Amino acid sequence: MIKQRTLKRIVQATGVGLHTGKKVTLTLRPAPANTGVIYRRTDLNPPVDFPADAKSVRDTMLCTCLVNEHDVRISTVEHLNAALAGLGIDNIIVEVDAPEIPIMDGSAAPFVYLLLDAGIDELNCAKKFVRIKETVRVEDGDKWAEFKPYNGFSLDFTIDFNHPAIDASTQRYTLNFSADAFMRQISRARTFGFMRDIEYLQSRGLCLGGSFDCAIVVDDYRVLNEDGLRFEDEFVRHKMLDAIGDLFMCGHNIIGAFTAYKSGHALNNKLLQAVLAKQEAWEYVTFEDDAKLPMAFRAPSMVLA
């Protein structure tokens, strides 16, 4: 039987909030089977929980937020959510003493390291996957995203940025997903932004944690970071990282083929909601026979060590 996963122990880290620029303490806690992914703000009294749920997602100019019925929100969840998807973590309590998850280096890699440091535990309960049964597509002008049936999890993402630093040959990336492929090829790709936008936002008291330490920063001509890029196609890899996190907002790994053109958080979420709203387009599946599990979700020994 393919089992649900949680953490072996509690781990903690500190970072800076992208919005406030203030120190944030992040605590990751194991959770029992069928808990799901829960984000918790401990800076509020009493603490407020935000279960990962496609319908709770709000896209802002700077990040993805989860918002509850009282309009209380927790921000910048997308990169940690991608790390949870990448390692197939089904049950976890994510606590922060702030309104946002720390931005860390702008990628998912610090969260992957933290999760691996905690250790991954298998629970004696079947893991539920969402399997795509019919093609579902959403569009917004010339942007689009779709899911098709596929016995695995594949991603094909194209961006279209007219910028000298983003070469035409590096605007498309495809991935046959696995935990190992995610860690090696996707998790280290950082978010990116224009220097002029960061300066403008900071002049208005926003994006106070934005810096070269947590993003690729470009001007009109080049990448400004001294160390340059981690991958020549880091921009599109990061957009794929975002999509992996966005699509895991249903709390389950998805079995299907995802293709997107110029998509972002809002359109990724629109696709996920469109799939879930169409009952005949998907189903929950479990795997009693390990041999029937798609290769995409077979954990390498380093993950479950």
From Swiss-Prot:
Cofactor dependence: Zn(2+)
Catalytic center residues: 265 (proton donor)
UniProt-listed Enzyme Commission number(s): 3.5.1.108
Gene Ontology cellular component list: membrane
Binding site for Zn(2+): 79, 238, 242
Keyword hit for DNA repair: no
GO biological process per UniProt: lipid A biosynthetic process
GO molecular function: metal ion binding; UDP-3-O-acyl-N-acetylglucosamine deacetylase activity
Transmembrane listed as a keyword: no
Keywords annotated in UniProt: Hydrolase, Lipid A biosynthesis, Lipid biosynthesis, Lipid metabolism, Metal-binding, Zinc
Pathway(s) the chain acts in: Glycolipid biosynthesis; lipid IV(A) biosynthesis; lipid IV(A) from (3R)-3-hydroxytetradecanoyl-[acyl-carrier-protein] and UDP-N-acetyl-alpha-D-glucosamine: step 2/6
Catalyzed reactions: a UDP-3-O-[(3R)-3-hydroxyacyl]-N-acetyl-alpha-D-glucosamine + H2O = a UDP-3-O-[(3R)-3-hydroxyacyl]-alpha-D-glucosamine + acetate
Broad EC category: hydrolase
Similarity annotation: Belongs to the LpxC family.
NCBIfam families tied to this protein: lpxC
Cited function: Catalyzes the hydrolysis of UDP-3-O-myristoyl-N-acetylglucosamine to form UDP-3-O-myristoylglucosamine and acetate, the committed step in lipid A biosynthesis.
Protein name: UDP-3-O-acyl-N-acetylglucosamine deacetylase
